[in-house]
């Protein structure tokens, strides 16, 4: 006969249980130790908000936080971070580009172009690169942690030339000289431009676009260098136009004798923009691109839209913007916007790159609607999706993201903040900071309240701005909560957990026997019953745990820890890859199951 005892855990630590069975003849005993954990956890509630730039001199936004009664007061902490610009965080990526150890054509270009762009913006703000060498302020208000420790990522390579203006000038000169030597005899560029190399249209367009950006930022080029590259692209575009026109020949026999092209493509759109920026407008290509706009990727549409804006083609531009808008996703909770690209069949091509597509769309919005909520949301999304902390996936997409953020900084006015930021809790002023371009990288960017400074109950946190410009802010409330029912929390990543009771069902299916006859065979079958909070289960019941994960960003690799309930044991006992649909590596531990996704 089985006998169960119900016990109550009165404290954390290790509990030793000794069971004895005593009789007059034979007796036995067993002793085991069990870990006893507190019914509680360190929990962080995250909040995001923005005080938009407006005509009104003073404006504010508020959030409401709740500090639980059942908690460890010494582990209560409220951190509020604020910034007048998120785009200014682009400077974090410069050291990566400068120190990139390889030197193909694109990498040679993007070692110095983003630094030059940033340098010119800083000069307009009355700053220089040396001013941000020892920057103390993390302008990305979404990131928590020690700003100084985060800044150490910049200094992997010492001394980093990106902060020395004389070194930057030498770096730019060397880059221009190397690109000049890599230019082929026909005026174009190849990948490495070595022996046997040929000019590639996309590579040449990338280089010419970069050199155009360089000249706009007062970089001196070798005479004729840029003109030869433009001439190569002009000839390339003329060929593509002719192929498109040949495809319109009605006589089939005559058309077969010609090289044809059925539709204008994404490369045509990129070359069209680069030549447009050189003052060369091919109206036939413009019309072909508009005719074939539905065949362009979202990336290609954004690039084409920039050229249309430059040419004053308002009607065509409005249609392109409308075409792109159907792929825009906006999230009011964390104030982001991004393109949900339908590029499952071509994501590995340059025109399917999601980061670059968002960057070029940001460049387009910086021209057409720089002060909209959507444009600011796109900036936030691009920053959120830095794959490597301070930079993105590659030198090229990092360079384009910096270029787009720089365009936004200039167009939105965020490069010239002039404001006072105040943080109030329950109407009481706790922080007041004056921010302008002179202290943008060194102002006090956070308020921290800990322990007894926060009482139990609800509190209203208000971020107030007086002056010019927006304020982006995030608040993080951390408690070691001891509540009987711990509620879920999350912002960028959310996890919902459900428990199901699995009840065995007698089920048979017909299969072929050893002689080919039809036989009934029992199969494993269960019905699922969802369990609610405080439902009771008994020892031996089989439960299924379901985790539903929602993510606002694209992540490469995450770990999810699912803490076990008291007395729960995993049915599977061997950790590793088990063929689950997510391809997750699973570790079964005493107190939790960890999923490496």
Each predicted region: which residue ranges?
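Long, domain-scale non-catalytic interaction/scaffolding regions in large secretory-pathway
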Residues: 1-29, 40, 59-70, 76, ...
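A conserved hydrophobic secondary-structure block that centers on an alpha-helix together
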Residues: 10-14, 101-105, 152-157, 163-169, ...
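Secretory-pathway-linked proteins and extracytosolic
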Residues: 25, 29-158
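Extracellular-facing binding/remodeling surfaces
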Residues: 90-100, 181-193, 283, 287, ...
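Well-ordered alpha-helical scaffold segments within catalytic/enzyme domains
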Residues: 96, 113-128, 146-165, 206-219, ...
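Residues within HEAT/ARM-like alpha-solenoid scaffolds
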Residues: 106-113, 163, 167-170, 198-206, ...
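Intrinsically disordered, low-complexity acidic Ser/Thr-rich regulatory segments
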Residues: 147-172, 177, 258-262, 520-536
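Core helices of alpha-solenoid repeat scaffolds
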Residues: 172, 185, 222-226, 230, ...
């Amino acid at each position: 006969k089985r006998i169960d005892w119900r016990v109550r855990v009165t404290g954390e630590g290790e509990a030793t249980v000794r069971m004895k069975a005593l009789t007059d003849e034979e007796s036995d005993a067993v002793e085991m130790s069990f870990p006893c954990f507190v019914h509680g956890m360190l929990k962080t509630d995250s909040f995001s908000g923005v005080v938009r730039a407006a005509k009104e001199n003073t404006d504010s936004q508020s959030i409401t936080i709740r500090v639980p009664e059942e908690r460890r007061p010494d582990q209560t902490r409220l951190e509020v971070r604020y910034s007048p610009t998120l785009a200014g965080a682009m400077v974090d990526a410069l050291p990566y580009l400068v120190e990139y150890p390889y030197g193909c054509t694109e990498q040679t270009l993007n070692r110095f172009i983003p630094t030059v762009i940033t340098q010119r913006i800083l000069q307009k703000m009355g700053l220089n690169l040396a001013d941000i060498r020892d920057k103390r302020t993390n302008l990305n208000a979404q990131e928590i942690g020690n700003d100084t420790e985060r800044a150490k990522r910049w200094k992997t390579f010492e001394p980093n030339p990106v902060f020395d203006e004389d070194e930057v000038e030498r770096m730019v000169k060397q880059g221009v000289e190397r690109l000049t030597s890599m230019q082929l005899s026909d005026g174009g560029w190849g990948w490495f431009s070595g022996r046997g190399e040929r000019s590639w249209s996309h590579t040449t367009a990338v280089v010419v676009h970069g050199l155009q950006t360089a000249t706009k930022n007062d970089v001196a080029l070798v005479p004729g260098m840029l003109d030869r590259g433009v001439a190569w692209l002009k000839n390339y575009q003329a060929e593509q136009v002719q192929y498109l026109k040949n495809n319109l020949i009605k006589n089939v026999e005559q058309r077969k004798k010609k090289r044809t092209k059925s539709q204008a493509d994404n490369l045509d759109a990129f070359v069209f923009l680069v030549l447009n920026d050189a003052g060369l407008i091919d109206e036939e290509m413009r019309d072909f691109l508009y005719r074939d706009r539905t065949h362009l990727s979202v990336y290609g549409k954004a690039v084409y839209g920039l050229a249309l804006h430059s040419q004053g083609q308002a009607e065509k531009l409005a249609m392109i913007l409308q075409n792109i808008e159907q792929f825009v996703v906006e999230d009011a909770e964390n104030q982001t916007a991004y393109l949900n690209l339908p590029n499952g069949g071509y994501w590995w091509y340059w025109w399917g790159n999601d980061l670059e597509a968002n960057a070029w769309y940001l460049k387009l919005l910086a021209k057409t609607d720089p002060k909209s909520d959507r444009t600011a949301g796109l900036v936030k999304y691009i920053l959120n999706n830095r794959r490597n902390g301070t930079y993105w996936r590659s030198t090229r997409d990092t360079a384009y993201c910096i270029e787009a953020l720089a365009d936004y900084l200039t167009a939105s006015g965020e490069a010239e903040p002039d404001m006072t930021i105040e943080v109030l809790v329950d109407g009481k002023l706790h922080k007041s900071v004056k921010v302008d371009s002179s202290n943008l990288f060194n102002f006090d960017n956070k308020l921290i309240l800990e322990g007894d400074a926060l009482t139990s109950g609800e509190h209203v946190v208000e971020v107030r701005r007086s002056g010019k410009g927006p304020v982006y802010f995030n608040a993080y409330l951390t408690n070691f909560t001891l509540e009987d029912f711990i509620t879920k929390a999350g912002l960028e990543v959310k996890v919902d957990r459900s428990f199901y009771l699995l009840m065995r069902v007698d089920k048979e299916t017909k299969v072929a026997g050893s002689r080919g006859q039809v036989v009934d065979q029992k199969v494993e079958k269960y019905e699922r019953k969802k369990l609610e909070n405080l439902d009771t289960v008994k020892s031996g019941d089989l439960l299924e745990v379901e985790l539903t994960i929602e993510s606002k960003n694209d992540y490469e690799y995450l770990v999810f820890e699912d803490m076990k309930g008291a007395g729960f044991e995993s049915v599977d006992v061997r950790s590793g890859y088990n063929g689950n649909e997510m391809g997750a590596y699973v570790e079964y531990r005493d107190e939790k199951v960890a999923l490496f996704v």
